[in-house]
Amino acid sequence: MFPSPALTPTPFSVKDILNLEQQQRSLASGDLSARLEATLAPASCMLAAFKPEAYSGPEAAASGLAELRAEMGPAPSPPKCSPAFPAAPTFYPGAYGDPDPAKDPRADKKELCALQKAVELDKAETDGAERPRARRRRKPRVLFSQAQVYELERRFKQQRYLSAPERDQLASVLKLTSTQVKIWFQNRRYKCKRQRQDQTLELLGPPPPPARRIAVPVLVRDGKPCLGDPAAYAPAYGVGLNAYGYNAYPYPSYGGAACSPGYSCAAYPAAPPAAQPPAASANSNFVNFGVGDLNTVQSPGMPQGNSGVSTLHGIRAW
């Protein structure tokens, strides 16, 4: 008989399969511990940053890790093709400085706003203080003396435009600057131009209306009335009795006694009915007389002492 060949280990035997499972479990537990340490390190860093009294050092973290492993038990074996998880960076509590737990972020924001407002106010004040300084001050107006004005006017009548040397010479004579002489000549030429324009407008414009003359009669001269010829004023004061329907009859038609000196008149008989004579009759009894003749008409039977009484006996009252 042939000797039995030596038993060579095959990767597919029961022992190899069991050993492979154990190796995978050990690798998985190592990866899990690395991942837990990586996740717990940032947590402990944050805890130490905000609550430093709760942080008790690496011993507490190790005990918590052991308890977590015991509770979770063996982890499932990951596949062989899966890459290993990269280790997360470890944070140290003192790397970035410990913030003050008593300080409120709202207070920081308020302080920042207050600083910004103060800076803006300072900038506005500086701008307001600089603006008046930047404004250019106007130079005072130059006042020429009478002798200077007279000499400038005389030179302007001779020559309206001056060259630079002539300006300098005139300025030195009058004790002025060349710029002052130049500006004076410019203003004088502009003034002459405006005067010519005004004269042209006056010539082209319509002529003004002539003054109206009104004749006013002189009524009083040297304290005495100067009426002149009364005949000239008679037409203005003429009274036409025909327009008012008054019928004037001749005085002899009344057959009664005259008035007594005591202003008592006798009764006159009733006047005859008014007969309307023809308008074109030459013997018309209507009378037209002026106001100036009223005082001269007197009754023949009335005494002269009673001349102040009205003597219009020919006017019939309504």
UniProtKB/Swiss-Prot annotation:
Keyword Manganese in the entry? The reply is no
Q: Which Gene3D superfamilies match?
A: Homeodomain-like
Q: In which tissues is it expressed?
A: Predominantly in the adult and embryonic heart, and to a lesser extent in lingual muscle, spleen and stomach.
GO biological process terms, semicolon-separated: adult heart development; apoptotic process; apoptotic process involved in heart morphogenesis; atrial cardiac muscle cell development; atrial cardiac muscle tissue development; atrial septum morphogenesis; atrioventricular node cell development; atrioventricular node cell fate commitment
For this protein, the record's SMART domains field holds: HOX
Where's DNA bound on this chain?
137-196
Q: Which Pfam families match?
A: Homeodomain (PF00046)
Q: Keywords for this entry?
A: Developmental protein, DNA-binding, Homeobox, Nucleus
The protein's assembly and partners: Homodimer (via the homeobox); binds DNA as homodimer. Interacts (via the homeobox) with TBX5 (via the T-box); this complex binds DNA. Interacts with HIPK1 and HIPK2, but not HIPK3. Interacts with the C-terminal zinc finger of GATA4 through its homeobox domain. Also interacts with JARID2 which represses its ability to activate transcription of ANF. Interacts with FBLIM1. Interacts with TBX18. Interacts with histone methyltransferase NSD2 (via HMG box). Interacts with NEDD9. Interacts with TBX1.
Q: What does this protein do?
A: Transcription factor required for the development of the heart and the spleen. During heart development, acts as a transcriptional activator of NPPA/ANF in cooperation with GATA4. May cooperate with TBX2 to negatively modulate expression of NPPA/ANF in the atrioventricular canal. Binds to the core DNA motif of NPPA promoter. Together with PBX1, required for spleen development through a mechanism that involves CDKN2B repression. Positively regulates transcription of genes such as COL3A1 and MMP2, resulting in increased pulmonary endothelial fibrosis in response to hypoxia.
Protein family (similarity comment): Belongs to the NK-2 homeobox family.
Q: What is this protein called?
A: Homeobox protein Nkx-2.5
Origin organism is: Mus musculus
Gene encoding this chain?
Nkx2-5
